[in-house]
């Protein structure tokens, strides 16, 4: 501050009366000092960030008094001008030549709206930017961006409140895309470090913090801007930062454009309508003029967003609608002279009134200190409340995290338990797989053996079929030979019969005896006829057998062992009929294989001891089949043609897994058929069926089976999960003991047995069927509470303050609720909607004795209004005292002069 103290007011202001004007606007009451609140409000109009303004205040107010003198205020203005022109904010910059500062002030057109955004240097220094870039790269950005999840831990490490961190994120995310690039991350870290240094975070991002890459481009290029700035400095002769229409008239007319077009360009560039153009507006006007002259592009009817000067973009909505006259700088100089004289007089007067001023200064200082302390206490109390709220939030968050930790531990235990179970299951499955693999290998070996056995049996079958075919081939000529022999025998027998008839006829002619005898024996004609009929029957039977054997469906039958009949040696008629009596006429078969067997065609003549009595012999007086059965010696009845089955000893497919059968048949092992409709069962089974009707009304008790062997499915489903309790109706109530539709009752007792369960079922329905549930009654809706203004205030019934209406007393006035209130334990879901006693609703949760929310709001409003009135009264009193003091001082000065 020593360097600043050496500079005079003229050196600080560079002879520009604007500094004096700014001072007079802020300094009120001719006290010679600028209060901190007034100076802060005025300096914020410069558009600089709060961080830079705070630094400027610290450099100006070196003593930390909280007030600025005139010289200190000029130093602050000079530093503001340095910051607006991109110079370093330090005391060494006071000696540099800079234009006067510019402030946002709608009362004067001479004050610009602040520096150009494009001209402002970035507040983030290069060394800080390098440090922030290193942090940015350590977070592993994706495509040059960091998401909120990656930036959040870095911001939380600063230990700043969540509200401030949220504001930092909103300010740094300039693109509002939910991600931060390298420049945006640098802005965020810059704001975080500023907040850690107890500097306030702005509500909106200052222009100086906007990265150059995020600043909108202007249609006027930097080269054009530099050229137009030189023209502007030559035109702005009063150095107030603006050019009027008179100053630029000649310059614009030299372009050769029509006056109407120049007027349109002037109206477009004069965005504030103050009749003057700033440096940026002047550059835009010349840009539009050159576009028309060089490219022939007419100016637009209104400015596009990229045409708006950067200095006017922030204050575009605050356009100035009126113009004000140019300030009279000569009058300002005279006022400055008078002010210097007054200062000299005040210095002389200070020697006389030094004690009084020191006391007043002490009082004011103490007052300001007290006020500062009060403000500090208020701020600290607010911070304490915020910290307490944050502490509560952290505690709640910690509790939630503890709960989540407990839940996760439980889930972890469950998962570990499940993993152990799964591991055990896997081990058991592996063991089962190993056993199954061993079984499969054994089954494969058995299958190979079975296939070998099958191939062997197939070969044996083929051999047997070949032997059968060869036997058939041998049988066919034998059968044919047999037929021929039978035909010859039948023809021979016919010839013998005819011969006998002729002989009988001849004998009847000459015989006179009553009992004539055949010439060659005692065999009569009936025996011959019998033998002939037997021969005919045998021929028919042989033909039928030959026809059956010739069919292809009976090729597998075994070879029949038939007697081979050789052609008999038939003697002539003289040899066939012999003279000796009672001899048998026997056809002979000369086959070696059947020589010892009985001849099926041997006809034994009946022993007729008596001769024919009469010549008129009746051959049908006696039954020729009484003595013997002609078919008792059937050669084809003793041998089974299918007895030689080659596969009856073993099943060639027994080892195949697809033809295996269980060792026990579930439908044959049971002793009784449970589905048999026969009525030969005992009365106990009938009664059991009658008592075990699962479909009777109300359900019946299904008695357990007395004998487990009667279950036809026990061998199949005995070990299954549903084998014991599948379709088990044993849990039903015991109501009906008889089944009216029992199919096992015999017809003789069905009427009595069916009539009885029907009567018993009717009785059981009326006695044991459970009653139906009562209909559900909806819960009565809760009555709406009375409005706050109409709440009844209950008076105390008792003088005892402890015996108030307890809203949570469940049994008012009863000592033993169990005895005196029988409805206490009643069913709350019964259909009855009326109760013996109705509870008083006013006794439940009665908070009418306390003030309502509306009353509290009204009280808060009254208190805030009262405090505001007191504050305004104090301010008015202070202003009145200052005014009286100023009047007294001016009167004393006038009287002395």
Curated annotation (Swiss-Prot):
Post-translational modification: Phosphorylated on serine upon DNA damage, probably by ATM or ATR. Phosphorylation on Tyr-850 is involved in the internalization of EGFR. Not required for membrane translocation after EGF treatment or for targeting to coated pits, but essential for a subsequent step in EGFR endocytosis.
One cellular component term from this protein's GO annotations in UniProt: AP-2 adaptor complex
Domain UIM: 852-871, 878-897
Residues annotated with Phosphoserine modification: 108, 140, 323-324, 467, 470, 485, 561-562, 748, 798, 816
Localization, UniProt: Cytoplasm; Cell membrane; Membrane, Clathrin-coated pit
Residues carrying Phosphothreonine: 321, 779, 781
SUPFAM superfamilies: EF-hand, Myosin rod fragments
Topology relative to the membrane: Peripheral membrane protein
Major location category of this protein: cytoplasm
CDD domains named among the record's database cross-references: EH
Record-given protein name: Epidermal growth factor receptor substrate 15
Organism, as annotated: Mus musculus
Highest classification ranks of the organism: Eukaryota, Metazoa, Chordata, Craniata, Vertebrata
Gene from which this protein is expressed: Eps15
């Amino acid at each position: 501050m020593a360097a600043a103290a050496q500079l005079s007011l003229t050196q600080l202001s560079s002879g520009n009366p604007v500094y004096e004007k700014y001072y007079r606007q802020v300094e009120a009451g001719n006290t010679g000092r600028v209060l901190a609140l007034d100076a802060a409000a005025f300096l914020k109009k410069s558009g600089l960030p709060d961080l830079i303004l705070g630094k400027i205040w610290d450099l100006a107010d070196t003593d930390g008094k909280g007030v600025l003198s005139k010289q200190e205020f000029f130093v602050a203005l000079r530093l503001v001008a340095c910051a607006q022109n991109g110079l370093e904010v330090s005391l060494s910059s006071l000696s540099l030549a800079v234009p006067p500062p510019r402030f946002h002030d709608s009362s004067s057109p001479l004050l610009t709206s602040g520096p150009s955004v494009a001209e402002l240097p970035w507040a983030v220094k290069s060394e800080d930017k390098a440090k922030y870039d290193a942090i940015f790269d350590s977070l592993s950005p994706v495509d040059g961006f960091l998401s909120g999840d990656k930036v959040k831990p870095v911001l939380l490490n600063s230990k700043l409140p969540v509200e401030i961190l949220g504001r930092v994120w909103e300010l740094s995310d300039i693109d509002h895309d939910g991600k931060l690039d390298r420049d945006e991350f640098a802005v965020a870290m810059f704001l975080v470090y500023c907040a850690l240094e107890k500097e306030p975070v702005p509500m909106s991002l200052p222009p100086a913090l906007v990265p150059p890459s995020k600043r909108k481009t202007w249609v006027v290029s930097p080269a054009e801007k530099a050229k137009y700035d030189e023209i502007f400095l030559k035109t702005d002769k009063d150095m107030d930062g603006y050019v009027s229409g008179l100053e630029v008239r000649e310059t614009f007319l030299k372009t050769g454009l029509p006056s109407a077009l120049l007027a349109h360009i002037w109206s477009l560039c004069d965005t504030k309508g103050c009749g003057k153009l700033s440096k940026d507006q002047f550059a835009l006007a010349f840009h539009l003029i050159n576009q028309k002259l060089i490219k022939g592009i007419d100016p637009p009817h209104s400015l596009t967003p990229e045409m708006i000067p950067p200095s006017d973009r922030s204050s575009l909505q605050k356009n100035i609608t009126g113009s004000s006259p140019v300030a009279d700088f000569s009058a300002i100089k005279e006022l400055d002279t008078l002010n210097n004289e007054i200062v000299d007089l005040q210095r002389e007067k200070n020697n006389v009134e030094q004690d009084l001023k020191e006391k007043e200064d002490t009082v004011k200082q103490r007052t300001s200190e007290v006020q500062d302390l009060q403000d500090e206490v208020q701020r600290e109390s607010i911070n304490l409340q915020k910290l307490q709220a944050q502490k509560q939030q952290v505690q709640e968050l910690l509790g939630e995290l503890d709960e989540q930790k407990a839940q996760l531990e439980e889930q972890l235990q469950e998962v570990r338990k499940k993993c152990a179970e799964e591991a055990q299951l896997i081990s058991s499955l592996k063991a089962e797989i190993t056993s199954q693999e061993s079984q499969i290998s054994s089954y494969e070996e058995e299958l190979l053996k079975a296939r070998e056995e099958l191939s062997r049996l197939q070969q044996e079958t083929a051999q047997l079929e070949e032997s059968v075919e060869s036997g058939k081939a041998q049988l066919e000529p034998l059968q044919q030979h047999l037929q021929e022999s039978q035909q010859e025998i039948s023809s021979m027998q016919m010839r013998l019969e005819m011969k006998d008839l002729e002989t009988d006829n001849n004998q009847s002619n000459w015989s006179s005896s009553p009992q004539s005898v055949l010439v060659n024996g005692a065999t009569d004609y009936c025996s011959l006829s019998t033998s002939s009929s037997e021969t005919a029957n045998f021929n028919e039977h042989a033909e039928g057998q030959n026809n059956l054997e010739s069919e292809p469906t009976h090729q597998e039958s075994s070879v029949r062992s038939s007697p081979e009949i050789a052609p008999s040696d038939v003697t002539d008629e003289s040899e066939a009929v012999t003279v000796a009596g009672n001899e048998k006429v026997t056809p002979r078969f000369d086959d070696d294989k059947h020589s010892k067997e009985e001849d099926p065609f041997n006809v034994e003549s009946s022993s007729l001891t008596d001769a024919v009595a009469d010549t008129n012999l009746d051959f049908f007086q006696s039954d020729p089949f009484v003595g013997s059965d002609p078919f008792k010696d059937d050669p084809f009845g003793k041998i089974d043609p299918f007895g030689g089955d080659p596969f009856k000893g073993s099943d060639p497919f027994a080892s195949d897994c697809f033809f295996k059968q269980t060792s026990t048949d579930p439908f044959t092992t049971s002793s009784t058929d449970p589905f048999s409709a026969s009525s030969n069962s005992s009365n106990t089974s009938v009664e059991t069926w009658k008592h075990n009707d699962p479909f009777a009304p109300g359900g019946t008790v299904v008695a357990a089976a007395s004998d487990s062997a009667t279950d036809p499915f026990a061998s199949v489903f005995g070990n299954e999960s549903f084998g014991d309790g599948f379709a088990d109706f044993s849990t039903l109530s015991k109501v009906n003991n008889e089944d009216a539709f029992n199919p096992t009752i015999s017809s003789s007792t069905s009427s009595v047995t069916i009539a009885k369960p029907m009567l018993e079922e009717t009785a059981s329905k009326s006695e044991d069927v459970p009653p139906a549930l009562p209909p559900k009654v909806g819960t009565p809706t809760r009555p709406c509470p009375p409005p706050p203004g109409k709440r009844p205030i209950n008076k105390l019934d008792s003088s005892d303050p402890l015996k108030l209406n307890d809203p949570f007393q469940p049994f008012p006035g009863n000592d033993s609720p169990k005895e005196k209130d029988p409805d206490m334990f009643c069913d709350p879901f019964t259909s009855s909607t009326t109760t013996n006693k109705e509870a008083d609703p006013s006794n439940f949760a009665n908070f009418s004795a306390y003030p309502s929310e509306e009353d509290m709001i009204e009280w808060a409003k009254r208190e805030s209004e009262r405090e505001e009135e007191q504050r305004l009264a104090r301010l008015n009193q202070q202003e009145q005292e200052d005014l009286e003091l100023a009047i007294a001082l001016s009167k004393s000065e006038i009287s002395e002069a």
